[in-house]
Structure formats: C-alpha cells, structure tokens
A protein has these predicted regions:
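Short, basic/low-complexity N-terminal boundary segments at the transition from targeting/disordered tails
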Residues: 1-14, 118-125
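Short, solvent-exposed secondary-structure boundary motifs
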Residues: 2-7, 21-26, 126-129, 135-137
C-alpha cells in the first residue's frame, strides 16, 4: 500500500479507510465496502459484477463473509453471482432473482463499460458470461 492506503487487486482499487474497513472500487463504476470483524466480515453491496469481487474479499480476509445489498439495483447487486448467499430487503428478493439471468447481466455490464467513469481495467471476456444461482435471504425492517 502507498501512503493513501490504496492498492490494486484484480483490477479493483482497494483503499483501507479505517481499521478493518475497506472501500472497494470496481473499475470506477461501483463502490462497495468490506468491514472485517473478529469472527466474520460484512460486504455491503457487490457492485456491477464485471469483476470477481469475491476474489478480492478472499484476498483481504479468510473470515466468512456476510453479503448485504443496499437495494436491488444492478450496480449494487450485479456481483451477487460471485457468492452463494446474500441478504437484501424483503421487497428486493423477487427483483434480484428475476435479474439473475444472462440477458440482463450481459446488457448491464456492456452499458457500464461505456460509461465515462469506467477506468478501462476490467477484462470481462470471461466474467460477462458467468452466471451462478445464489440464495437471497430477506431482511425485514427493524430486524438488524
């Protein structure tokens, strides 16, 4: 790490922002946060999914990781495919399941690569077609 606590992992820009807290930037397109606790980690959002954020998490910690989506928007949940299980608000569950298909994934990632913010570091030839069924656990308001 340099004096800004920034490093690259698989093209993602990772910055240590506090003790055990990392900001993970997915190619200038999406931002996620990883909080590492004593017995497990928490990943807030999974980004677009153009890159393998799970591999980045594994590079930063060996602890089991709980994954939570802020909402169902693909820029927050496109990387869910890299995990077996995620948590989201109960109203987002149906949408998350519906958008986990090849057509939605490919179209969304291709649109993101055309954005001005995209830094050109993603190689999506292998990742754009990756699809994995994951379990979505509903969270109700007031339960966390």
């Amino acid at each position: 790490m340099d004096n800004m606590n920034i490093r690259k992992i698989n093209g993602f820009t990772v910055q240590l922002v506090a003790d055990g807290v990392y900001a993970i930037d997915e190619f200038g397109i999406a931002l996620m946060y990883l909080i590492i606790g004593k017995t497990q980690a928490l990943l807030l959002d999974t980004g677009v999914g153009a890159g393998n954020v799970h591999a980045v998490v594994k590079e930063l910690t060996d602890l089991p990781c709980l994954v939570v989506n802020y909402n169902h928007h693909y820029e927050n949940a496109g990387g869910n495919v890299w995990f077996d299980e995620v948590y989201a608000h109960k109203n987002a569950v149906i949408v998350l399941k519906e958008q986990n298909c090849q057509e939605v994934r490919r179209a969304f990632i291709e649109r993101q690569l055309d954005r001005e913010e995209y830094n050109g570091e993603a190689s999506v030839a292998d990742t754009i077609s990756y699809l994995h069924e994951y379990r979505v656990n509903p969270i109700e308001e007031g339960k966390v």
